[in-house]
Design a protein with these regions (language model features):
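Proteins that catalyze or organize thiol-disulfide redox chemistry
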Residues: 1-45, 49-71, 85-86, 96-98, ...
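Flexible N-lobe loop architecture of eukaryotic-like protein kinase catalytic domains
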Residues: 92
Length: 165
């Protein structure tokens, strides 16, 4: 059995337009349109952060990654509390990073502080109502299948693709 993996598809990331639909910055002026209204259709995770916050710098890339992997089942909105102090006060943000999930126009879940990817993924899976798989896991499964079929060339190509990510 031969598995052909399009290298461009395997390394694909959302385009700027797709990414903009999944991940955006918000402000006090646009919060209702960016968070409340979309949360009527799909869960919206709001990441309250600040540029000086060390834990924010490790959490935000993880949240962005899991948001992309969720494939539109959850959206992410980021709010810089230094630029949106009024909004942070209204939502009683005491420390950063603080993450709230909105569904149906209301906050339904959240956490404070940096979290490992496994916890962020579990948080998203609760919101999405099911597993959010890393694309790497699917590629590794394909590679294992290729090895089981003695297709070493395909397996090698798949493993190299994973390492290059």
């Amino acid at each position: 059995m031969s598995i052909i993996l399009d290298a461009t598809a395997a390394n694909a990331t959302p385009t700027a337009g797709q990414d903009k639909d999944l991940i955006k910055d918000s402000s006090v002026e646009t919060f209702v349109q960016d968070v409340i209204e979309p949360s009527m259709e799909v869960p919206v995770v709001v990441d309250f952060w600040a540029p000086w916050c060390g834990p924010c710098k490790s959490l935000t890339p993880t949240i962005e990654k899991v948001t992309r992997e969720a494939g539109g089942r959850v959206k992410l909105v980021k709010v810089n509390i230094d630029e949106n102090q009024e909004l942070a006060m209204q939502l009683r943000i005491q420390s950063v990073p603080t993450v709230y999930a909105f569904k149906g126009g209301r906050p339904v879940d959240g956490f404070q502080g940096a979290q490992p990817e496994s916890e962020v993924r579990a948080f998203y899976e609760r919101l999405a109502g099911g597993p959010i798989e890393s694309p790497i896991a699917a590629i590794l499964d394909q590679a294992a299948g290729a090895l089981a079929d003695d297709d070493h060339e395909t397996a090698h190509g798949l493993y190299v693709g994973v390492l290059e990510r």
